[in-house]
């Protein structure tokens, strides 16, 4: 409960910072315009900036929300799963903070104890160690917390890829309000809408000949040792 309260406070604080940044940008643009801008024009421009800021602004807010969601699926994460999630988070930090400075990203890394922002992460675990569930939890939380994200998951075969996407969807349905965001879903792809932004989660069998033109902000290879190197 204490962690959830702290995350919520951090989320609120981050949105407040985003709002202040948006206001400064608007004031700067108004000052450089020829003549004077009417109050209505300023208010309308500020409103648009605030909406944009709250949507993309705070990578810190999105990150805090993602970690909150990881503990909201009704599953108790193991120590290893938490470590996997920290590693996977490091791989997507550049995407989450793509509109912000490296300094802001480093602050968030310190807060959440993320050790690396390298965009490649590999984990080697025994079977039956909860890695597939950990992947499904991470993808579901990321899609909800970061609107507009595109995730591509590659598994060893069609059955495995279908089951993984089903698991992601089941976790999404555990979160109040998430079901309403799912606009389409089939055995291979799930789309979610958040305002004007659409997130896409795809789960494919690892066969290179059928996967031309696929990719995403996050690419996950489950059991990578058994997936064709052509992927």
What kind of feature is each model-predicted range?
Residues 2-231:
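Phosphate/NTP-binding elements of NTP-utilizing enzymes
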